[in-house]
Curated annotation (Swiss-Prot):
Belongs to the RNR ribonuclease family. Its main location: cytoplasm. SUPFAM superfamilies: Nucleic acid-binding proteins. It comes from Schizosaccharomyces pombe (strain 972 / ATCC 24843). Keywords: Cytoplasm, Hydrolase, Nuclease. The lineage of its organism: Eukaryota, Fungi, Dikarya, Ascomycota, Taphrinomycotina. The keyword Cytoplasm applies. This is Uncharacterized ribonuclease C609.01.
Length: 1157
């Protein structure tokens, strides 16, 4: 055998460390640990420091580059005029730069370039050339030099600024914000005597303008380079906290910060002249109050992270409650709760941030007070008495479980109309469940904190949305005339609009963006109504600490709401998909090896060209099957294209692939990962010699054992390509395909450690938890199902990925790229389903036991209930580097101790990186050449963008379904379908339309009920129905008033709110839905009248108002009550309506009343 081939030996694979095992480092004993806080491994904190330094190094290198963005033309004074300037290309925004950072102009020498202020005239800082002045160098050394004074010495006798700008008398406040768990316990995580964990953050001296935007500061380049070359972080075990000089302004800013921003100090707004001295700007600018904390200087972050004062993690915003966010880190066992926009500090979804921990009890108390204040204000506007307002506000706060509106069968408190509409707009745009993380004293977060710096922003430069002349709130809409008069008076010109307009992003997690009025089309102010259905692209330009909203730039209009192509473009931009074309030079940088392959390359590889290899559904890898002389013993070969041989590290094509991360597969189209010509050259092609990395396994199909397994580089000669449809059609007649299917069953049994007969199709739905759905364009059945041959190939891929990861772990365990999926923290729902169905599962069940139980269950409803419940519980997978004694890197969903991505190198960048690691292992170089910091940067970028791409694919699926449903709604009325009940509660019903993949939580306050009762022991919900007009009740409760709904209401709803036509598609799948949408006649219409009847109905419905509260009240006693029992695992009838009157299509799903059945 070729010496480059490696025989797989399980004895060389390191075992997964036990959480209870004692590490060899200076880990404190269990008696010395504080509470249940986890011990922080030194390599985990060290990895954060190294990653930060890698970002700073990339920052300093990228500032000398200028990427052009040819697809976007910012609107100028006349954006739609014929004399459009061709040289208005904007430089591509630097993803590493915090908000407000500007990039140098390559046409201007750096020593003469100066930052430009908002008006475009004047400067806001010194020239870049002044950074080398002796004055600035001396000042930098004084700022970052340590001192011996204690932190408490600076905090005594401090006073905060007035709460309101311009207050007559400055009143001192003593309110200080506590850090997390500060106490006298020497082993407290924030105790100075405990060097093993977090210590309280000390304020930083420096100009407010520098901290607001580090890259605009005069010391930014000097500080970044100094931190990279002179600051070496020490071990967090023994290093003491550095003492840093403080100024009164920065002390007040960090110590007296409150969540509502009331006690934040005024900004100093200091600047520097050419000699380095401080100068003040106008007094008017000093009147602006800081609403957010300035960011910490980038140069100070490595020290703070190394001493445990700050944690680094990725920020995720709650989609339903956008004031709350969470930061996920590798250090803590649970996410860090971020309360409110002030603590989130101008960050966006997916940002890599630095967080300081705060006291959880104080954060929760502040949140409770804010919610009670909001509820009290809303109740006061409704005319309630003062006593009633106070009592109801306390009752409806987060301290009680009645916040969602139900209390043991009585509709005591319904959600506010704002809450109902917000939930509908968020969940209606989604394919899967959108859980609202409700906080109560019983379910308070374990950690809380606030953001003090943004390290990396991987999100795209643009987002989609609509324009509004005034800020979208009730007060502005009621006073449009006064706003118009005031703006005209202040400008001195009659009819001139305001100075700014508002951009409302389609993604509600992005705040409103202020756009300068000179960037909008000239006719926007005169014909504002013409732009209500226009979708634009805009980007955030800067976000100062004194502004509640960011300032942005308007780029272009992409079309009209309701157009499927416009929605597709919006998805691409909102989820950071790279829409620009590849440079032509990248298409010619890779050439296929000549045939025959040179002899020197053949000597390095195992020659498998004589094997009959074939491809099924993909050109990333090929298979071969050999039947030996022994009955039941076969040889299965999996040969993956060696893309890493062609795409060399650090070449331009490699850089572009690293930026794109992976291919984006959407139903409306795909965003390629590599140029088309390059992909064709490096993919496997039948009839050509191809370079591959092969894993060959010898299986005994009778005993289900692996006799031999080998891994190494090879050369193959593929003979044929078979589509998935053809493979499935010939599965019963083709011997090779049957052996592939049998091999998949054997390998899956080995992975799950069982000898039971498995249903591989039942495991397919968990592919959602590991990334994008493969072959999404070929979906024609259920979203959760695929061809049996496709399921078999998926299981073979999982086995191969596990073996590759295990082999790399045996070579260099500290640098191997792994794919981990953490075990769910809460198994309550799965245990409840197990008790309900009689399945033997518990919270201590292993992943193999859970998956085996699902794959062997015979009852279809029980299997679906277990599938969907577990899928909803599972965490998202992510990439990580190596292992440590405090980190779990196992893959829960696939039941693998080690897992990676290897089989699709033409679609994912991580697969190419894994191939490079394999090359190092084959060549006998255990010390992987790529440094640790670069690997961390790669995995962080891949994690964030992979999450964006998966959400984009889900949004694409939902948009496609809504277009089909909307087409049927227009012709045949509401779509009736069966739904599977997943869970019930006293406040909601969770249902899944299995064939479409639609998941919804139906709140009971949107159903026309007279009463309801929930039996917690039996998990049953009893609904007493008032009327059969359930769809009309739901739409009226949500106050839906869109053009799409109004057209539907006039055509199909009668005077009593009943739908005159219902399209019955109870057992339809996706392909049936597509056929029905394409047909010219109504499909499965329940009722169809003649032309005269339709005209009469349309006329009568158009003359009656059926949307008022009086009509809802009249419906309550119109029908006799009918009691319906709902339980998990039951099938119910639902009505579906799709609304395409927004940038992203909405779907409304409600239960069909049994009165109309």
């Amino acid at each position: 055998m070729d010496p480059h081939w490696k025989r797989h030996d399980s004895s060389n694979i390191p075992t997964q460390p036990s959480p209870s095992a004692s590490p060899k480092s200076n880990k404190p004993s269990s008696a010395q640990r504080f509470g249940n806080l986890p011990w922080v491994a030194p390599d985990v904190i060290q990895s954060q420091i190294e990653y930060l330094q890698a970002l700073q190094m990339q920052q300093s290198l990228s500032e000398s580059e200028n990427y052009l963005q040819p697809n976007f033309f910012p609107f100028q004074s006349g954006p739609f005029s014929k004399s459009r300037r061709e040289n208005t290309l904007l430089p591509r925004l630097n993803p590493l730069a915090p908000i407000g950072a500007r990039q140098p102009n390559p046409s201007i020498p750096q020593q003469f370039s100066k930052p430009i202020n908002e008006s475009g005239t004047g400067t806001m800082g010194p020239a870049v050339g002044e950074l080398t002045s002796p004055v600035m160098k001396n000042r930098a050394e004084s700022i970052f030099s340590p001192v011996t004074e204690s932190f408490e010495a600076f905090t005594q006798g401090m006073q905060t600024t007035p709460q309101r700008a311009g207050a007559g008398v400055s009143t001192a406040t003593s309110h200080t914000r506590r850090r997390s768990s500060a106490g006298t316990d020497p082993f407290s995580p924030v105790s100075p005597s405990n060097p093993n964990f977090l210590t309280p953050l000390k304020p930083i001296d420096g100009n407010q303008e520098w901290q607001q935007s580090p890259l605009e500061s005069p010391l930014s380049m000097h500080s970044l380079q100094e931190s990279l070359h002179s600051v070496e972080p020490e071990s967090p075990i023994f290093q003491q906290a550095p003492q840093i000089p403080l100024s009164n302004a920065s002390q007040q800013s960090y110590i007296n910060h409150s969540s509502d921003g009331a006690s934040l100090p005024q900004s100093s707004f200091l600047n520097f002249n050419s000699s380095g001295k401080r100068v003040s700007v106008s007094a008017a600018a000093q009147q602006h109050k800081n609403l957010f904390l300035p960011y910490l200087p980038q140069a100070s972050l490595p020290k703070f992270i190394g001493t445990g004062k700050l944690l680094v993690g990725t920020l995720h915003i709650n989609r339903k409650n956008r004031s709350d966010a969470y930061v996920i880190t590798d250090v803590l066992d649970e996410p860090i709760f971020i309360c409110g926009s002030k603590d989130r500090n101008r960050t966006l979804e997916g940002d890599l941030v630095a967080v300081e921990l705060l006291d959880v009890n104080e954060i929760m108390q502040t949140k409770r007070e804010k919610e009670e204040k909001k509820i009290r204000r809303n109740l006061s506007l409704s005319g309630s008495s003062k006593y009633s307002v106070n009592s109801k506000a306390k009752m409806m706060s987060i301290s009680t479980p009645m916040a969602l509106g139900m209390n043991r069968g009585v509709l005591s408190f319904e959600r506010s109309i704002e809450k109902r509409k917000n939930d509908y707009e968020v969940t209606g745009q989604s394919l899967s469940f959108v859980d609202d993380v409700s906080l109560t004293p019983d379910s308070a977060p374990k950690y809380a904190g606030h953001v003090v710096a943004v390290l990396n922003r991987p999100s795209g430069e643009t987002c989609s949305g609509t324009l509004a002349l005034y800020r979208p709130n009730s007060l502005a809409l009621k006073n449009q005339s006064s706003h118009r008069r005031n703006s005209s008076t202040s400008s001195g010109e009659t009819g001139k609009g305001p100075k700014i307009v508002w951009f409302k992003p389609s993604d509600k997690r992005i705040p409103l963006i202020a756009i300068s009025s000179d960037q909008v089309p000239p006719t926007f102010f005169t014909n504002n109504d013409d732009f209500k259905d226009k979708v634009f692209l805009a980007g955030i330009k800067r976000w100062p600490t004194t502004s509640l909203h960011p300032f942005g730039t308007l780029y272009e209009s992409i079309g009209t709401i309701g157009d499927p192509k416009v929605e597709y473009k919006a998805i691409l931009h909102d989820f950071s998909c790279h829409t620009y074309d590849f440079p032509e030079s990248l298409s010619h940088c890779v050439k296929r090896l000549p045939t025959p392959i040179p002899a020197e390359e053949l000597q390095k590889r195992y020659n498998l060209r004589d094997k009959l290899t074939f491809m099924i559904g993909t050109r990333d890898y090929a298979l071969h099957i050999d039947t030996g002389s022994i009955d039941g013993v076969i040889t299965l070969g999996i040969h993956v294209a060696d893309v890493a041989y062609y795409v060399k590290q650090d070449m331009p094509l490699d850089d572009e692939a690293a930026n794109r991360v992976s291919e984006v597969q959407l139903l409306q189209g795909s965003v390629p990962f590599l140029p088309k010509k390059v992909s064709e050259e490096i993919s496997l092609i039948e009839g050509h010699d191809c370079l591959t990395i092969s894993i060959v396994v010898q299986l005994d199909l009778k005993s289900g054992a692996v006799l031999q397994c080998s891994l190494g580089p090879s050369v193959i000669h593929p003979s044929s390509f078979i589509s998935l449809e053809s493979a499935q059609a010939n599965l019963q007649t083709n011997e090779a395909l049957q052996l592939v299917d049998a091999s998949a069953h054997v390998l899956t049994k080995l992975r799950l450690k069982t000898d039971k007969k498995l249903d591989l199709q039942s495991l397919y739905c968990f592919e959602f938890c590991d990334g994008q759905i493969p072959n999404i364009q070929n979906i024609n059945m259920s979203i959760f199902e695929a061809f049996p041959i496709a399921c078999s190939l998926q299981q073979i891929e999982h086995w191969v990925n596990e073996k590759v990861a295990s082999h790399l772990m045996s070579v260099f365990p500290s640098k191997v790229i792994l794919r981990k999926n953490q075990r769910p923290s809460d198994f309550a729902s799965l245990v409840a389903v197990s008790e309900l169905t009689g399945v033997n599962l518990s919270a201590s069940s292993t992943p193999s036991e859970i998956m085996t139980e699902i794959a062997t269950t015979k009852d279809k409803r029980t299997k679906m209930l277990l599938q969907l419940t577990l899928r909803r519980m599972c965490n998202e997978s992510e990439y990580t580097i190596g292992t440590s004694n405090a980190k779990d890197v196992s893959h829960f969903v696939f039941s693998c101790p080690y897992y990676t991505h290897f089989c699709h190198p033409t679609r994912r960048y991580i697969d190419i990186c894994v191939q490079r690691q394999l090359r190092e292992a084959f060549d006998g170089r255990p010390d992987f050449s790529k440094d640790y910091r670069s690997l961390l940067s790669i995995t962080q970028s891949c994690n964030t963008l992979s999450n964006f791409y998966r959400n984009a694919q889900e949004k694409s699926l939902h948009a496609y379904l809504c277009q089909l449903l909307h087409s049927i709604n227009l012709r045949s009325g509401l779509v009736k379908h069966k739904a599977f009940v997943l869970a019930v509660d006293q406040e909601y019903i969770d249902i899944v339309i299995y064939e479409f993949g639609l998941e919804r939580r139906i709140s009971l306050d949107l159903l026309p009920l007279s009463n309801c009762d929930f039996n917690e022991q039996k998990h049953e919900l009893y609904l007493s129905w008032r009327t059969n007009a359930s769809f009309f009740y739901a739409s009226s409760s949500l106050e839906i008033d869109t053009p799409c709904f109004n057209d539907f209401k006039k055509k199909f709803l009668d005077s009593n709110g009943m739908c005159k036509q219902i399209c019955d598609m109870m057992d339809a799948q996706v392909r049936d839905l597509a056929n029905a949408a394409e047909s010219q006649e109504s499909f499965y219409s329940k009722a169809r009248g003649n032309d005269s009847t339709s005209k009469t109905a349309k006329s009568s419905s158009g003359n009656q108002d059926i949307s008022g509260d009086g009509k809802l009240h009249s419906l309550r006693m119109k029908e006799p009550e009918v009691v319906q029992t709902i339980r998990p695992g039951q099938e119910v009838s639902v009505l579906i309506f799709a609304d395409t009157s927004a940038t992203y299509s909405l779907s409304l799903i409600t239960l069909q009343s049994p009165l109309s059945s």
